[in-house]
């Protein structure tokens, strides 16, 4: 989706109020938060030129994800999912403590997504996501929070082709990036991506 057909680089994305768009491409790398479904639920959206409390909104709008441990829903949550697209199975465990009597809050998330073969032939998916956050709040309005997360991923790609090729092989899911080498399946375009991140946030409610 492109708001007003503008490039995604005009959509400003923040985490705890800090800008997170890539400095080279200008776009936000959503693979940075892949698998963190419960964490990315805490988000504020702002339309272009709409007043908000975290940015001078971008031409294609702005999003601000709240990764503070105290903002996560309390309790334990276990999720098991099956799909027939990028991955086949997903397991997720999420924990949030909420603030205790001493003003501490903790949150964690572990997610694993796997596919031996995705929707398209020759594709596989192997991704592990983690999140850990801690926050301390004082009665004088000050709060300190630390969060770290990552999403190491190994996935095989799908290549584009032409109608003529699809007709010749009689398969509209034909993937030119894969084949057999020495009797084993091999994809020539395997993406390995891991960009660990951490953020330290000081809040002072005056």
Regions found by a protein language model. Give the residues of each.
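Short, glycine-/polar-rich solvent-exposed loops and beta-turns at beta-strand/coil boundaries
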Residues: 1, 5, 55-58, 123-125
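Extracytoplasmic beta-strand/coil segments of soluble accessory domains associated
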Residues: 1-19
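Extracytoplasmic
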Residues: 8-10, 38-40, 58-60, 73-75, ...
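Short beta-strands and strand-coil junctions in structured, solvent-facing domains, enriched
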Residues: 10, 21-22, 50-53
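Short acidic/polar hinge/loop motifs at secondary-structure boundaries
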Residues: 18-47, 66-68, 72, 173
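Extracytoplasmic loops and strand-loop junctions of Gram-negative outer membrane beta-barrel proteins
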Residues: 45-46, 75-79, 113-117, 177-186
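Transmembrane beta-barrel wall of Gram-negative outer-membrane proteins
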Residues: 82-115, 119-158, 187-205
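Flexible, surface-exposed loop regions and adjacent strand-edge segments
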Residues: 124-129, 161-171
């Amino acid at each position: 989706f492109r708001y007003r057909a503008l490039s995604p680089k005009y959509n400003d994305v923040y985490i705890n109020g800090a800008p997170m768009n890539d400095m080279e491409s200008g776009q936000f790398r959503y693979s940075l938060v892949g698998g963190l479904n419960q964490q990315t639920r805490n988000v504020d959206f702002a339309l272009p030129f709409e007043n908000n409390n975290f940015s001078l909104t971008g031409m294609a709008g702005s999003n601000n994800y709240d990764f503070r441990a105290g903002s996560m829903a309390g309790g334990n949550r276990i999720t098991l999912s099956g799909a027939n697209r990028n991955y086949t199975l997903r397991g997720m465990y999420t924990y949030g403590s909420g603030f205790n009597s001493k003003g501490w809050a903790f949150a964690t998330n572990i997610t694993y997504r796997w596919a031996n073969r995705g929707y398209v032939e020759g594709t596989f998916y192997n991704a592990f996501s983690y999140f850990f956050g801690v926050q301390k709040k004082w009665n004088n309005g000050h709060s300190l929070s630390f969060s770290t997360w990552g999403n190491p991923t190994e996935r095989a790609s799908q290549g584009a082709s032409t109608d003529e090729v699809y007709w010749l092989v009689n398969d509209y899911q034909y993937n030119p990036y894969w084949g057999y080498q020495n009797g084993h399946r091999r994809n020539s375009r395997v993406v390995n991506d891991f960009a660990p991140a951490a953020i330290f946030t000081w809040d002072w409610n005056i």
